[in-house]
Amino acid sequence: MHVSYSLALGFGLAAAAAATPAGAATLLALTNDSRLVEIDSETLGAGRPVAIRGAEGRLLGIDQRAADGRIYGVTDTGRIVTIDHRSGQAVVVARLSEPFTPGGRSVVDFNPMADRLRLMGMNGANFRVHPDTGAVTRDGGLTYQPGPLGGTVPRIVAGAYTNSIGKPSSTALYTIDTSLGQLNLQAPPNEGVQQARGAMESLPAGVAFDILADAQGGNRAWLLSAGQLGVVTLETGQVRLLGAVAGLPGSEIVDIAALH
């Protein structure tokens, strides 16, 4: 069945949908009340929410670490935790060496080359974190490169690295600015420079985003927004909607991790 989606979805993503997307994935969604929900991108169905226990705080974001395959999260109390997404049991493995105040949404994503956790906030905070010790390196604040958007304050709400499988020879960090409806390449990541890649049209303030790499060197970018699942073209920012995810909880989704 072929279904078309329009602006009636509540946000103006450019979209034409297919019933069964190529490269189907299992996505792990994090709610704002610290629950995990598995999403099947092929069936567009959500599993039963699993409450996270033992995190010692509210989870700000999650990601799967390429180095060991485990799910990691960062809490609003500065804890770095590993999470069994089947049971919801979290274990504190480290504490951030410096306080992190995101000023809204947070980005939590692993750099697979360096095996370091990128932690960023809507207020421009840009941390590089050792996941085993919690040691923080404060990198350059988030800014747009000189040009049409130079001087504009980024409001980055989501971000993810490419090639997050094994220990790759290269990677790239993509971010989403919902105030401008913009997909960016953050390069260099440590300097926080946002390079515009394409307009994503009107987006809600909160979106969840991750990139799933495959063994052949491909990358598929997933977006969850207002209960709708889509695929993002990283070269242009265009979003192809796949449809509404059935069975999502009423709580806001703040992050997704695409599972290997």
Located regions from the model:
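Loop/turn residues immediately N-terminal
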Residues: 33-37, 69, 77-81, 123-126, ...
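N-terminal signal peptide c-region/cleavage motif recognized by signal peptidases
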Residues: 17-21
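Conserved beta-propeller blade signature
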Residues: 26-30, 70-73, 116-119, 168, ...
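A short beta-strand motif characteristic of beta-propeller blades
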Residues: 45-54, 89-99, 138-149, 193-201, ...
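Blade-level signature of beta-propeller repeat domains, shared across WD40, Kelch, NHL, RCC1
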Residues: 239-260
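Structural signature of eukaryotic scaffold interfaces centered on beta-propeller domains
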Residues: 60-68, 99-115, 151-169, 205-217, ...
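An edge-strand/N-cap motif at the start of beta-rich repeat modules
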Residues: 24-42
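Short loop/turn segments that connect beta-strands within beta-propeller blades
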Residues: 41-44, 84-88, 130-134, 188-191, ...
